[in-house]
């Protein structure tokens, strides 16, 4: 029997709309001088995909929906799989600089994927000679994945399957030994409908089990919070990022040297790279909203995804993820105190999850029938018009560590790697923390109507890092934003 989407996978499928395409992504810049003859043909990249694609089963599967969404769809092999549809070749418009590349990536990322095909697509992008700091002749590779098929770690597994730790050159010509896709293991309609009834009963039994454990679970949470002095996460204040999103996106990415990150961690014992990244985003949001005269008195709230994926799950696709909803202390004036507060909050929140387990809300997601999820997805699509409340967080901060050694695509050496998130109505800013070689990267995707000036937020991120670095080394600093004025949160309409 074909594998079925999980409830979490289905959530991302049902909420995919023109304004909220549920796609995450990566892009890298590559130096072809290490490839055979110092040049990479597009067909070399196609050949690389062709010889590696079977390592990632999710890359050649598509969804088969159950009539009327009575149950979650099934994954079936795409017998008409067309690699040249999924891997495309384009050129960056002149002047071919970093700004143009970010604009192009934002536009490509804003387009929904075709849900009738395997849920990913990539672009090889030439014409990057106007980008400072990279060798001439470089090309970029951008790839996006639907979150129903790949979470952040599964997407990273796909990306790594295409790469090597040394220059490896594709052998043979693209299409020379093209495999015939195996016959799709398609379930019949009667079988799917029958299973939908069985699955519904299982979900109701699971819901009853979770309900029976609700009071003990809540008691454990209260006991843990009281023991560790951890306050209940407050409601988020409303900001410009917590309104309906348009289909338009802006994107940018910044790099920071690992050497400076290590100095900060050495100066503040116990601080993790994730703590530092959350603090940088906190400080940057504080600065950005202050310039708009919209900085709330209350701390902003962030959703930080937590991967539950095990080593044996590599290449399997799908979603195995939970999340923490935490204050990021944007109401603290001093950057060093912000870092310490973030470290304290993240440490206790992670400890609570390990000791108490996932929240009731996370557990209940697995009990919601597909018909209800599908209806909720349609409701989310019209939510901007009917004034539905936004989600529980102001922004998302996702940490997906990357390789510390050189990686090669079709023999070309990667010189940069960056991640790209997704937006939802009510959460119009997504920050991704990643790493490659000797750099830590913070990239962000935002709704263009909510952030018409991404260069201002980009500058705020860089200034935030510099302030934290200076503060941790000197132990003191005079922040440029000294006070928080009366809260000017965005009003709900």
Residue ranges and their predicted role:
Residues 1-8, 27-38, 46-427, 431-462, ...:
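Soluble acyl-CoA-dependent acyltransferase catalytic core bearing the H(X)4D motif
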Residues 42:
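Active-site regions of oxyanion-processing enzymes, predominantly non-cytosolic
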Residues 1-23:
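Generic start-of-chain signal for non-secretory N-termini
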């Amino acid at each position: 029997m074909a594998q079925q989407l999980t409830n979490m996978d289905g959530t991302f499928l049902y909420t995919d709309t023109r304004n909220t395409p549920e796609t995450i992504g990566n892009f890298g810049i590559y130096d072809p001088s290490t490839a055979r003859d110092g040049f990479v043909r597009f067909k070399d990249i196609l050949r690389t995909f062709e010889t590696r694609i079977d390592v990632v089963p999710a890359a050649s599967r598509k969804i088969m929906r159950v009539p009327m969404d009575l149950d979650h769809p099934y994954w079936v092999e795409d017998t008409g799989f067309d690699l040249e549809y999924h891997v495309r070749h384009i050129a960056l418009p002149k002047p071919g600089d970093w700004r143009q590349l970010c604009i192009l990536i934002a536009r490509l990322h804003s387009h929904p994927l075709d849900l009738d095909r395997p849920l990913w697509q990539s672009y090889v992008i030439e014409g990057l000679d106007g980008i400072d700091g990279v060798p001439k002749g470089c090309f970029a590779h951008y790839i996006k994945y639907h979150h129903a098929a790949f979470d952040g770690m599964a997407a990273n597994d796909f990306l790594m399957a295409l790469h090597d730790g040394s220059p490896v050159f594709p052998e043979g010509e693209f299409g020379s030994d093209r495999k015939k896709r195996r016959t799709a293991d398609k379930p019949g309609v009667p079988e799917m409908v029958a299973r939908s009834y069985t699955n519904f009963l299982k979900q109701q039994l699971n819901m009853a089990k979770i309900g029976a454990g609700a009071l003990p679970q809540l008691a454990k949470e209260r006991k843990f919070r009281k023991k560790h002095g951890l306050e209940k996460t407050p409601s988020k204040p409303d900001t410009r990022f917590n309104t309906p999103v348009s289909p338009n996106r802006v994107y940018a990415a910044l790099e920071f040297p690992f050497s400076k990150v290590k100095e900060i961690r050495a100066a503040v014992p116990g601080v993790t790279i994730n703590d530092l990244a959350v603090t940088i985003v906190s400080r940057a949001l504080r600065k950005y909203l202050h310039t708009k005269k919209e900085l709330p008195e209350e701390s902003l709230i962030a959703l930080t995804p937590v991967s539950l994926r095990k080593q044996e799950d590599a290449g399997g696709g799908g979603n195995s993820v939970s999340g923490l909803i935490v204050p990021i202390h944007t109401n603290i004036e001093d950057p060093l105190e912000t870092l310490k507060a973030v470290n304290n909050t993240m440490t206790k929140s992670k400890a609570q999850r390990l000791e108490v387990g996932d929240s009731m809300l996370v557990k209940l997601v697995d009990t919601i029938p597909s018909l209800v999820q599908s209806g909720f997805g349609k409701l989310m699509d019209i939510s901007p018009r009917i004034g539905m409340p936004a989600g529980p967080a102001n922004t998302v901060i996702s940490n997906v560590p990357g390789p510390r050694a050189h990686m090669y695509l079709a023999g070309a050496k990667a010189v940069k790697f960056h991640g790209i998130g997704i937006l939802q109505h009510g959460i119009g800013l997504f920050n991704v923390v990643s790493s490659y070689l000797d750099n830590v990267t913070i990239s962000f995707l935002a709704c263009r109507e909510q952030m018409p000036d991404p260069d201002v937020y980009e500058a705020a991120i860089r200034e935030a890092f510099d302030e934290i670095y200076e503060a941790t080394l000197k132990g003191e600093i005079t922040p440029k934003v000294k006070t928080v004025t009366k809260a000017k949160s965005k009003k709900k309409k």
